């Protein structure tokens, strides 16, 4: 369970106040206008941005006081950040170690991660030899190899076409359910949220709150979000 209490975050005069909320296992869509603070929220939890105040408790520890590498969080960004000169196998292995040589156990773990995202047989290819969807799968495999209980997704599939994006969303849902992860997915697409998100978080007017069940939340748009949804 991830519990947020008295959390304030943002830049300059744009400080967002998050309602006290507890997130259990499941997928949460994070929806709001551009510049509302969606990505900053994820970056604050991950440790890439400092909070103004408050706490984010997981297993009796405040994430906001931990070093980035010690937080139980893995994050996937819009850019897949694959190194073009390295093979897909080596790119994924970087989640475990930067050393050139891996133990047999580590090699098996990398292979298993690639197999899980449907990239078995692509180990020796370079990122430039893969399609956009396959590159997204490789980036997801690298995140999975970190074995973190909280997964933050900052529009990682926004550049993909509808069919490939849906494929990746379905894969995330399958993995989240199997691993009982807490997943926060930033998206501008209500369709994406309806497809895989159990619950929805709205961010607007310097406020972040859990709106509840995704289908119900998107059928009953609050006044603060009317301009965004149109």
Regions found by a protein language model. Name each.
Residues 104-122, 173-174:
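Conserved ABC ATPase "signature" region
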Residues 207-230:
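Conserved beta-strand-loop-alpha-helix hinge in the C-terminal portion
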Residues 151-155:
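Catalytic Walker B motif of ABC-type/P-loop ATPase nucleotide-binding domains
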Residues 46:
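Helix-to-loop junction immediately C-terminal to a conserved catalytic motif
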């Amino acid at each position: 369970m991830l519990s947020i209490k008295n959390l304030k975050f943002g830049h300059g005069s744009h400080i967002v106040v998050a309602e006290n909320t507890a997130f259990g296992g499941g997928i949460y869509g994070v929806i709001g206008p551009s510049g509302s603070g969606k990505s900053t929220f994820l970056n604050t939890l991950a440790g890439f941005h400092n909070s103004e105040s408050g706490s984010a408790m997981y297993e009796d520890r405040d994430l906001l006081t931990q070093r980035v590498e010690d937080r139980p969080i893995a994050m996937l960004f819009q850019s897949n950040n694959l190194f073009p000169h390295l093979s897909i196998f080596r790119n994924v292995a970087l989640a475990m170690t930067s050393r050139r040589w891996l133990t047999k156990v580590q090699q098996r773990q990398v292979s298993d991660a690639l197999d899980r995202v449907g990239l078995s047989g692509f180990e020796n290819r370079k990122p430039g030899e893969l399609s956009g969807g396959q590159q997204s799968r490789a980036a997801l495999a690298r995140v999975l190899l970190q074995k973190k209980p909280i997964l933050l997704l900052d529009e990682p599939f926004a550049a993909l076409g509808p069919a490939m994006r849906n494929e990746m969303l379905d894969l995330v849902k399958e993995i989240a359910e199997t691993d009982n992860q807490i997943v926060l997915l930033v998206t501008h697409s209500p369709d994406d949220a309806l497809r895989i998100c159990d619950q929805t978080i709205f961010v607007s007017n310097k406020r972040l709150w859990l709106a509840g069940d995704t289908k119900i939340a998107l059928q009953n748009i609050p006044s603060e979000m009317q301009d965004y949804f149109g």
